[in-house]
Amino acid sequence: MEQEGQEKKKEGRLTLVLALRTLIAAFGSSFQYAYNVSVCNSPSELMTEFYNDTYYDRTGELIDEFPLTLLWSVTVSMFPSGGFAGSLLVGPLVNKFGRKGALLFNNIFSIVPAILMGCSKVARSFELIIISRLLVGICAGVSSNVVPMYLGELAPKNLRGALGVESQLFITLGILVAQIFGLRSIRQQKGWPILLGLTGGPAAAACPPFFPESPRYLLIGQEPRCRQKALQSLRGWDSVDRELEEIRREDEAARAAGLVSVRALCAMRGLAWQLISVVPLMWQQLSGVNAIYYYDQIYLSPLDTDTQYYTAATGAVNVLMTVCTVFVVESWARLLLLLGFSPLAPTCCVLTAALALQDTVSWMPYISIVCIIVYVIGHAIGPAIRSLYTEIFLQSGRPPTWWGQVHWLSNFTVGLVFPLIQWAGLYSFIIFGVACLSTTVYTFLIVPETKGKSFIEIIRRFIRMNKVEVSPDREELKDFPPDVSE
């Protein structure tokens, strides 16, 4: 009994090996993803000027304003387009190469475009930038799905939430670094290609070959000695039989389900509540946070000081709150973190009023700053969302990356819809406020708690919610067809 108690105590420890491997993997993938989200914002004027100069050198004519705007929109939209394409590749990549192998293969889509973008000005080719944005979007689409999956499967259940937040932490750091590098005091007219090319560095560190594969994936590949060795390396001790047994039981449930595709996931009654629980991921993208990051310089333009410093300050607040979340995610319930959306709806109303009055009331822009910071804090509190989809699906349901496709489709939708709702002007944030309120209510009523539970315990709860017949000794999901893979 005493030995069992010691084993349980050990399972709650964060070993140095586990910490280093999760930190480096999250840095190499999530950091470069976020860096590419923000890196084009500050040098956009210099880049469009380069587009115009290049076209003039070729034809002797300048690009008209509308075609130039359209060309820049294509450049920006290539990133989420590539992200959606990358999310479609996740299933084949992780099933063929494993979690670690998929991250190693994914480096191609970051290092190659980094070189192309770094050489674009010398080559006098803006087409290289457009193509590179598509390729680096593919890299982001793969990494934003595989990294949370990889981190969630490496971590013991009592640390899964905290380690899962690491990817979100490096996303906020990537945004902050891109904002700092974009400050006018640092950025130089000839330095923006270097700014774009820096994305290749973190990708090279994403997942060194000597990193272990996910023990849960190794169970699928029928490599018992490899998975035991990998788990012992992560935990720092030899006694891992208890956790291996838990992994084996999950594997039995996954084998009963078979490998499933996204279409099959949507059609299966046995996964109805899991799919419903992923809806807040879509609402997170539709809640207007991208508008805050992309257009805050417009909102703060009445201020006399340089608004780029306020932009960097919001990025710093985002990082700080995400760091705080790492330490509280295992102490607080997941739902409490997900409900970080709750203050955003009234914040949208106050921000709308502040923006409407900032030209007539001198101190209103500072109210806008406070609202923007509150908005950023609310979104920073919600990174537990990223670990949610790893927790609620079995092995067979993770590779299709339902979460990833929802994320990138929502991201792309925001990019298309936001210009259309700008007719509402300042009142567009009322629309975002409705989205935030809807997310809060939906999360409270629908999404179940997963804190401190093993994958099997979480699946058991969903089985009861889905009203699926269960065999207690084998955890077979009778509602699943024997083979639903395409």
Curated annotation (Swiss-Prot):
Residues 1-19, 93-99, 151-162, 212-274, 328-334, 386-402, 448-486 are cytoplasmic. It catalyses: D-fructose(out) = D-fructose(in). This is Solute carrier family 2, facilitated glucose transporter member 5. Detected in jejunum. Detected at the intestinal brush-border membrane (at protein level). Detected in duodenum, jejunum and kidney. Keywords: Acetylation, Cell membrane, Glycoprotein, Membrane, Sugar transport, Transmembrane, Transmembrane helix, Transport. GO terms for cellular component: apical plasma membrane; plasma membrane; sarcolemma. The keyword Acetylation applies.
